[in-house]
Structures are given as structure tokens and as C-alpha cells.
Amino acid sequence: MSVSKIAFVLSAIASLAVADTSAAETAELQAIIGDINSHLSDYLGLETGNSGFQIPSDVLSVYQQVMTYTDDAYTTLFSELDFDAITKTIVKLPWYTTRLSSEIAAALASVSPASSEAASSSEAASSSKAASSSEATSSAAPSSSAAPSSSAAPSSSAESSSKAVSSSVAPTTSSVSTSTVETASNAGQRVNAGAASFGAVVAGAAALLL
């Protein structure tokens, strides 16, 4: 079977894009697919002998296996390629440093705020709980020197304050969790949509390069 190396790499990226990946990996794949769609001629140009582009050995070994197939069953070999293998291939692109790396960085930044917000919520929750504990301790101190009836009021106040803090922390944590899930979900939907259109690009590239 005759399959060009570039068509193989593009097909492998498309295959990985529809697999289960983390939010960060999804964002990076989205950036790569977007760059391929916008600069397909650059990628097709890699097929020339003077491009200087070399496929990493682990990816090349899978490509060599593909060449032994006589039908489309070779696509099952894509499962042998993981995200790291694709990353090692991408960083060898001539325009990785000048163009693609900044696009990937921007894509990763789009999913990082959710993680940052979650961390801030966790710190806020810890601070609130510490304040609640401190307040409860302070309220308990006067009860040892006061009459039993007077100690009940501070204790009740501390309990109410603790419940109020807990109540305020819960919605915040829930909101952040929902935001994180929505961010990952939206990123997944975007890359799936990109992968769908990218599939047509790969088919066209393969037709030109086979």
C-alpha cells in the first residue's frame, strides 16, 4: 500500500483528536488542527525531499507497518500512537517555533483559568473554615467563666456562623466544578467539530499525496 508520510501523520492526528483526551490535550490538538486547516500547503510541502522534516522513530515504525497493508485496515495501527508520539512529531515542524508553539500556548491558556479558579476556591474554603474554627474557639473561652445560660449564646452564635460559612463555600465550590466541566466539555465539542472538518482535509491531502 502506498501512503505518504505526511498523509499518515495527518490521519494519525485526526484519529487521536476523536479519542478520549484531557482538556489540555484537547486544546493542543485543536490548535494543531486549526493550523493544519489554515496552512495545509505548508504541510503538503513537507513531502518534498528538501523540507528537512523527519518523523520520530516510534511514529516511523508504525508508518512502516502501514506500508505492509493492502487495504484500509491499516487505520487500526493508529491506536499504537499516543499523544506524546504526536507531540514529538509536531515539535519537529519547521514552523513550530515561529508559529505553532504560540498557537498551542494560547489554546492551553484558554483552559487554564478553570484550574486556577478551582485552586482559588479551595484556598478560600480553607481560609473560611479556619476562620470559623477560630471564631468557635474564641466564643467557647468566655463560657468557662460565665454562667451556663450565658455560655449557650456564644456557642449558638459560633454554630450559626459556621453554618453560614459552610453554606457560602458550598455554592462556590459547586459553581467552580460546573465551570470546569463546562470548559472541558466545550473544548471537546470544539475539537470534535474541528476534527470532522479536518477529516475532509486529510482525505483531500491523502488523495494528493498517494
Swiss-Prot record:
User: What range does the record give for the signal peptide?
Assistant: 1-19
InterPro entries associated with the record: SRP1_TIP1, Yeast_SRP1/TIP1_CWP
Name what induces it.
Induced during anaerobic growth and by cold shock and heat shock.
Keyword Glycoprotein appears in the UniProt entry: yes
Report how it sits in the membrane. Answer: Lipid-anchor; GPI-anchor
Q: Which residues form the propeptide?
A: 187-210
Gene Ontology terms describing biological process? fungal-type cell wall organization
Record's keyword terms, sorted? Cell wall, Glycoprotein, GPI-anchor, Hydrolase, Lipoprotein, Membrane, Secreted, Signal, Stress response
Cite a GO CC annotation.
Answer: fungal-type cell wall
Tell me yes or no: is Membrane among this UniProt entry's keywords: yes
Record GO terms (molecular function): lipase activity; structural constituent of cell wall
Q: What is its EC number?
A: 3.1.1.-
Renumbered to this chain, the positions carrying a covalent lipid of the kind GPI-anchor amidated asparagine are N186
Recorded hits in PROSITE patterns, A to Z, give: SRP1_TIP1
Where is region (Disordered) located? 122-186
At the top of the EC hierarchy, this enzyme's class is: hydrolase
| Similarity remark | Belongs to the SRP1/TIP1 family.
What further fact does the record state? Present with 35600 molecules/cell in log phase SD medium.
Q: Tell me, in a sentence or two, what this protein's role is.
A: Seems to have esterase activity. Prefers ester of fatty acids from 4 to 16 carbon atoms.
Q: Kindly provide the name given to this protein in its UniProt entry.
A: Temperature shock-inducible protein 1
Q: Which species is this UniProt entry from? A: Saccharomyces cerevisiae (strain ATCC 204508 / S288c)
